[in-house]
Structure formats: C-alpha cells, structure tokens
A protein has these predicted regions:
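Mid/C-terminal beta-alpha module of Rossmann-like enzyme folds, strongest
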Residues: 1-71, 89-91, 98-127
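Aromatic-glycine-rich donor-binding/catalytic loop that engages nucleotide-sugar donors
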Residues: 74-78
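Zn-dependent metallopeptidase/amidohydrolase metal-coordination segment
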Residues: 83
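Catalytic phosphate/metal-binding cores of nucleic-acid and nucleotide-processing enzymes, i.e., regions
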Residues: 86
Length: 127
C-alpha cells in the first residue's frame, strides 16, 4: 500500500452490542450488560473514552469521531484482525503485566464507581 489512507476500523460499522458480543466471544465470557442512556451518563459525569473506553456519544464535540470513509484503504488491501482474536490476545498480554499494574487501570471505571452508577441507574430506571 502506498499513499495516504484513513484506516479506522472495523471494515463495517459495529453497534456497541455487536462489538461487546464479539469481545465476549474472544475472551470466552458471558457478560451481564446493563444499557443506560447517554443522558444518564452525562448527568453522572461519566467521561467518554476515559471512563468508558470506546463509548463516544454521537453528538456535540464527539460527533463523527472515528467515522471516516475507509473504502480507499480497503480497496488497496487493508484487512482487520478478527475482533475476538484481538480481544483474546489483549487479555493474554494484560495477564503478563505485573499484578500492581493490572490493579491500576489507566482508563475505565473503578469497580466502586461502576457499582454506584448501576445503583443510581436502577433507582432512575425503576421510576
């Protein structure tokens, strides 16, 4: 491949549900997912990308994030690894890190914050 290409992936857009399903298949787990609204996440001051990696609201400053036409790159031969394989390999790598590094994630919600958010969501959703 020669030239300048946009190479965001995947080759076809994935919904959040489909992406999480493929990741779960790759790491051989059955997650229990709770879907909450973007408005709830914003009200709870959950930061896109940092608190919930890969979650980006589709409006405001984030509109169009990672949404590029990649047909030229695909036509030139760009291929993506299967997402389940990438997830499995990433988990394998993560498990090689020292325990203290595994416990200090640089992104994502802490277990305590996740629990609090889910409790807040349950209180709002029950109304």
């Amino acid at each position: 491949m020669l030239g300048v290409f946009n190479g965001t992936g995947p080759a076809q857009p994935l919904t959040m549900r489909a992406m999480l399903s493929e990741i779960a298949a790759g790491i051989q787990t059955e997650p229990r997912l709770t879907w909450v609204s973007t408005d709830f996440l914003k009200a709870q001051k959950v930061s896109p990308w940092r608190d919930l990696p890969v979650w980006i609201p589709g409006q405001g400053d984030w509109a169009g994030f990672a949404r590029r036409d990649i047909r030229r790159a695909l036509d030139a031969g760009l291929v993506f690894r299967p997402l389940p394989q990438t997830a499995a390999d990433t988990l394998t790598y993560f498990k090689t890190l020292p325990q203290d590094r595994q416990e200090k994630l640089k992104a994502g919600l802490s277990a305590e914050r996740e629990t609090a958010l889910l409790a807040n969501w349950a209180a709002v959703a029950d109304k």
